Design a protein with these regions (language model features):
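Residue-level signature of mid-helix packing/kink "hotspots" within the transmembrane helices
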Residues: 28, 56-64, 149
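Conserved MFS/SLC helix-loop-helix module at the cytosolic interface between two early adjacent transmembrane helices
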Residues: 61-100
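Extracytoplasmic
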Residues: 12-45
Length: 200
């Protein structure tokens, strides 16, 4: 093990945190899902546009409250919570494929993604040596990009080989759950910042 900036480079701890960036990319399935759900359910253009709105509205509403909760409950707790919600958002439309359940699932996917986005970067900074943080943050975006690129081709494979593109939801939902289990199994020493309270 190498000691840098008083912190060891521990791949066993870093790897599950990096996997959360792969999970972060799963929100891009909304883009893949819009056309396919519209075709499957013969939706009007107006109804189809509700699908991405259900997912992407949440970052603007929840990013600040999630940050406040994170300072109280911890980064790993919130990151795991976000990935659990992400898994639920993927499994709901797979198991219950109706328009209402797709909207509910994609809303959960958006909420989970918001939590993961808020929590993943700070936790990654906590688990890597300080002088390596910029390079690992850059690499985390590469991991996220891989997940984003895999969605469309996997949907095509599942549709052509198994006749069901929605298997993508099942596979990525299982990956989210495995990521939660892996992250929960490692010991992480989080950096806790002291809050300065302002009273009027």
């Amino acid at each position: 093990t190498i000691l840098m900036n008083d912190k060891k480079l521990n791949i066993k701890v870093i790897a599950p945190v990096l996997l959360s960036f792969f999970v972060m990319s799963f929100v891009d399935l909304v883009g893949i899902g819009v056309d396919r759900v519209s075709n499957d359910m013969d939706l009007s253009a107006t109804l189809a546009q509700l699908i991405p709105s259900a997912a992407f509205l949440w970052f603007f509403l929840l990013s600040v409250p999630v940050g406040v909760l994170q300072s109280r409950l911890g980064k790993r707790f919130m990151l795991n919570a976000g990935m659990v919600v992400t898994a639920a958002g993927l499994l709901v439309p797979y198991l219950f494929y109706t328009f209402e359940m797709v909207l509910a699932g994609f809303a959960l996917l958006g909420i989970g993604n918001t939590i993961v986005q808020v929590s993943a970067n700070p936790l990654l900074v906590d688990v890597v040596p300080g002088n390596r943080a910029p390079s690992f943050l850059s690499f985390s975006q590469f991991v996220k990009a891989i997940g984003s690129m895999l969605g469309a081709p996997l949907a095509l494979v599942f549709a052509s080989r198994f006749g069901d593109w929605k298997l993508l939801f099942l596979v990525f939902g299982v990956v989210s759950i495995l990521s939660v289990i892996w992250l929960g199994s490692v010991k992480i020493d989080e950096v806790v910042k002291q809050e300065t309270r302002v009273s009027l």
